Amino acid sequence: MKLPGLNAARTGLNEAAARAAGYDVETVVAVNDDKAHYYPGADNFITKLVVDKNTKKLLGVQVLGPGAVDKMVDIGVTAISLGATLDQLENMDLAYAPPFSTAIHPFVVAVNILLNKMNGDLESMTPAEYMENRGEGYRVLDAAQAPSIPNAKFVDVAKVHGPLEDVDKDEKLMIICTKSKRAYMLQQRLKYFGYTDTTVVEGGLWFNELPVKGK
C-alpha cells in the first residue's frame, strides 16, 4: 500500500490473528535504517515481526516506511513459505550496496532484535504495552544522543562506567531513546553494573507518542 510519504506492506498473520489461531506468540517492533544512513534519501523501516514462541517459526511481518517495504515483506513471504525459524534467518547475507540497504540487512537486524528479546538479553515492552500504561511506576531514563524527554533523567551511554548517581539498583527503570538501539546498549551496561529491573520501550521516540512523564 502506498500512502503520501509512507509505504506499508504485510504478510502472514498479525498478532491478533496469530493469537486467535492458538499460537503462543512473541513479537517485536524494530526501527532501523532502510539503507546506509549517510546515503542521500536514507530513512527508516518500522518492522513488526510475529513468531510462534515455541518453535521460533515466523508467522507474520508488517513494515512501514518511505522506502522499499515490498523487499522486506518478500523476505518474510519466503521465510513463512519455507517454515523458517528465527535461528535460520539470523545470519542471512542479503544483497548490500549503500543506496539500497545496510551491511546487515534491516530484516536480519529485526530478526536479531527479536532473538535477543526471546533469549532474555533484551527486556522490553511493546508499544501496545506502553500505551496500556505498563510503564506506570517506572522511572524514565532518556538514552537519546541529546536530552529529548521532558522531566526524564538523561544518561549518555558512552559515559556509563559504573553505577548511576541517584539511581538505585533495584529501581524500576524504563529506558527510551530515538530508535531503541542506545536504550538497549544502556540496558546492557546497567545490567552489568547490577541493575535488576530495566525495560526498553520498543520503537523508541520514533514510534511512541510524547510527552513521556519522567520521575
Write out the residue ranges for each language-model feature.
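Rhodanese-like catalytic fold shared by cysteine-dependent sulfurtransferases
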Residues: 87-98, 102-124, 134-138, 145-174, ...
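Generic beta-strand/beta-sheet core signal
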Residues: 28-30, 143, 176
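Mid-to-C-terminal Rossmann-like scaffold of FAD/NAD(P)H-dependent oxidoreductases
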Residues: 1-67, 102, 106-132, 138
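Generic secondary-structure signature for well-ordered alpha-helical cores
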Residues: 6, 23, 81-85, 94
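A short, polar/charged loop-to-alpha-helix boundary motif
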Residues: 66-85
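Short polybasic/polar patches that bind polyanions
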Residues: 19, 80, 191
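Generic hydrophobic alpha-helical segments
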Residues: 15, 76-80, 130, 173
